[in-house]
């Protein structure tokens, strides 16, 4: 009997996650100087993390032989102040928000339970749900309507077997927010857990932030992360805000030491450096507008409005997305080919914000390819 015979059938159905390409990979494959590569493919903060973090991390080096605190009171307090949510309604994950997603699926899902996911959206939702035995019911962000959520496609899929519904807002990769009235309708129409993914909410208008719904509704869990505006994608810190009861259940099965000492210190310092946060947010929104307005000038592209730190672009010059992204790679520009997103035709790519210098170079290269 081979190892293939022992592997679960559901795992054999999966395709490996396709992450954004790294500068190192492109430098190797195309012989380009890494310093000249523009990385606009992974929704990162191009200005990095708070410069105060490096100093704090040096203080931690002498403690790396010690286990981290399973729950860091200082980190919990800082998150509480930032979100204006009680500490007891917060749970922190050490693999970004992915850990919170996975823990929720472990808690909720029995074989043949159902999870509703509108597509296109973040692919990790379906992977985590399926591996724990759920059947996926697909709803949709309507392409013909600017990728607005088709709320009826969610509501019509709700059954007595529905355990969870994922709503990403702003949605990845489309960048648009889900209207609050649609989310309210969904939350109030079911007792299934509605997971509102706010990974990019800092870049949106304040009115779209529904984090406080975790106190208003027992069936809401809001996902947040340090990977975007805080510039800590490499430290993998995320958190959930939800009912005290659900936090208690998650704490029973959460990996004990999943959040490293370095990650804890980095997250605390990032929250405390409010000036750097404000700078990154302000310049991030300005960068987004610069790229959006620049791309809108190309008639061969359709650029979708966004409330995140990236935007979705449709190629209409006869090339598919893979051909277009390959042309950019050869010139040292990394964007995200969206061919692997369920529910998207092979003509879309996603581009993240860059520094203003990177944006200028990117738009110049785009003009060479498009025109």
From Swiss-Prot:
Modified residues (N6-(pyridoxal phosphate)lysine): 228
Cofactors that this protein relies on: pyridoxal 5'-phosphate
Pathway: Amino-acid biosynthesis; L-histidine biosynthesis; L-histidine from 5-phospho-alpha-D-ribose 1-diphosphate: step 7/9
Alphabetical list of InterPro entries matching this protein: Aminotransferase_I/II_large (IPR004839), HisP_aminotrans (IPR005861), PyrdxlP-dep_Trfase (IPR015424), PyrdxlP-dep_Trfase_major (IPR015421), PyrdxlP-dep_Trfase_small (IPR015422)
This protein's UniProt keywords: Amino-acid biosynthesis, Aminotransferase, Histidine biosynthesis, Pyridoxal phosphate, Transferase
Catalyzed chemical reaction(s): L-histidinol phosphate + 2-oxoglutarate = 3-(imidazol-4-yl)-2-oxopropyl phosphate + L-glutamate
UniProt GO BP: L-histidine biosynthetic process
Entry's EC annotation: 2.6.1.9
A GO term, aspect molecular function: histidinol-phosphate transaminase activity
Keyword Transcription regulation listed: no
Pfam family, one: Aminotran_1_2
Protein family per UniProt: Belongs to the class-II pyridoxal-phosphate-dependent aminotransferase family. Histidinol-phosphate aminotransferase subfamily.
Full protein name: Histidinol-phosphate aminotransferase
Organism the protein comes from: Methanococcus maripaludis (strain C6 / ATCC BAA-1332)
Source species taxonomy: Archaea, Methanobacteriati, Methanobacteriota, Methanomada group, Methanococci
């Amino acid at each position: 009997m081979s190892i293939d015979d022992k592997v679960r059938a559901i795992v054999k159905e999966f395709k490996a996650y396709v992450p954004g390409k790294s500068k190192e990979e492109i430098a190797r494959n195309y012989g380009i100087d890494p310093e000249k590569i523009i990385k606009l493919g992974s929704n990162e903060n191009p200005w990095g993390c708070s410069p105060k973090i490096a100093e704090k991390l040096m203080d931690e080096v002498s403690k790396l032989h010690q286990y981290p605190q399973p729950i860091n009171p200082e980190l919990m307090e800082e998150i509480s102040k930032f979100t204006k949510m009680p500490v007891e309604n917060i749970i922190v994950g050490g693999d970004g928000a992915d850990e919170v997603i996975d823990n929720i699926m472990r808690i909720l899902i029995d074989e043949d339970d159902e999870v509703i996911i509108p597509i296109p959206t973040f692919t990790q939702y379906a992977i985590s749900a399926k591996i724990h035995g759920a059947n996926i019911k697909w709803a949709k962000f309507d392409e013909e309507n600017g990728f607005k959520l088709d709320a009826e496609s969610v509501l019509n899929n709700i059954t007595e077997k529905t355990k969870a519904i994922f709503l990403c807002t702003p949605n990845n990769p489309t960048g648009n927010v889900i209207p609050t009235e649609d989310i309210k309708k969904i939350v109030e129409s079911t007792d299934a857990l509605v997971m509102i993914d706010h990974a990019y909410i800092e870049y949106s208008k304040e009115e779209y932030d529904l984090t406080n719904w975790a106190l208003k509704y027992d069936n809401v869990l809001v996902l947040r992360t340090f990977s975007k505006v805080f510039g800590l994608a490499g430290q993998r810190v995320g958190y959930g805000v939800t009912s005290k009861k659900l936090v208690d259940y998650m704490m029973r099965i959460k990996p004990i030491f999943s959040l490293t000492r370095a990650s804890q210190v980095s997250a605390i310092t990032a929250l405390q450096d409010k000036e750097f946060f404000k700078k990154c947010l302000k310049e991030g929104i300005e960068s987004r507008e610069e790229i959006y307005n620049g791309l809108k000038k190309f008639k061969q592209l359709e650029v979708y409005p966004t409330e995140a730190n990236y935007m979705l672009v449709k190629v209409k010059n006869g090339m598919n997305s893979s051909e277009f992204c390959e042309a950019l790679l050869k010139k040292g520009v990394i964007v995200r080919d969206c061919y692997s997103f369920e529910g998207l035709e092979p003509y879309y790519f996603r581009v993240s914000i860059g520094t203003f210098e990177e944006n200028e170079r990117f738009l110049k290269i785009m003009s060479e390819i498009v025109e």
